[in-house]
Amino acid sequence: MKLSLSPPPYADAPVVVLISGLGGSGSYWLPQLAVLEQEYQVVCYDQRGTGNNPDTLAEDYSIAQMAAELHQALVAAGIEHYAVVGHALGALVGMQLALDYPASVTVLISVNGWLRINAHTRRCFQVRERLLYSGGAQAWVEAQPLFLYPADWMAARVPRLEAEDALALAHFQGKNNLLRRLNALKRADFSHHADRIRCPVQIICASDDLLVPTACSSELHAALPDSQKMVMPYGGHACNVTDPETFNALLLNGLASLLHHREAAL
């Protein structure tokens, strides 16, 4: 699996791995790259079956497989220890990595994540699946911003959204791969295992997230033994895109604090 690695800003700089959500594209993290690369070696990638890592996914594709293939790619690149920043599905992969490779994951940042899928989130995906079956890739892509961004943010950026739609259609991961990745997301359940995650965790959520209620982050916070929760008042599900200034400040402070906390505990 292909990874994109930034040059380390100094010798032995900590590594931060960015894991996007269901869309799978590493470019989702573009608003974070410049600030992160000043202090960390940053790893981005397109998830298997998407972008520049094309593949046909098995019907039983799982979050555990997503975590294993990423860890193996990191080890092959010479990376043994890394912090994880995961958004939604990416946060699930991050938790799986922390469970399966505890000696490697130094810190976990969960952005609009959850322990197991919430009934409201499941309803949203059911609607989106019906759109995919009835209207194909175009209907899926055109509906996606409604679940990602606040209404006023979208209304002020119509040309940008039209360009994003065209790009998403051109690089659509395919119906079968999308549904298999979505099914992996829906099957994931960390409610009985989260208390085994021992690395420090920062939980970031947005109070106006239409797709994932903030209660999901509260449940995560209660279940994770060494966690802190930060709530952004605005930004929607893709709060790192819509309000990068606020998000980046939380992320940078969280990474620095938790990495220091972990080193002090060793």
Curated annotation (Swiss-Prot):
Catalysed reactions listed for this entry: carbamate + 2 H(+) = NH4(+) + CO2
Similarity section: Belongs to the AB hydrolase superfamily. Hydrolase RutD family.
Gene coding for it: rutD
Listed GO biological process terms: nitrogen utilization; uracil catabolic process
EC numbers, comma separated: 3.5.1.-
Protein name: Putative carbamate hydrolase RutD
Listed GO MF terms: hydrolase activity, acting on carbon-nitrogen (but not peptide) bonds, in linear amides
Organism lineage string: Bacteria, Pseudomonadati, Pseudomonadota, Gammaproteobacteria, Enterobacterales
Enzyme class: hydrolase
Keyword check for Hydrolase: yes
Keywords assigned by UniProt, alphabetized: Hydrolase
Keyword Protease: no
Superkingdom, natural source: Bacteria
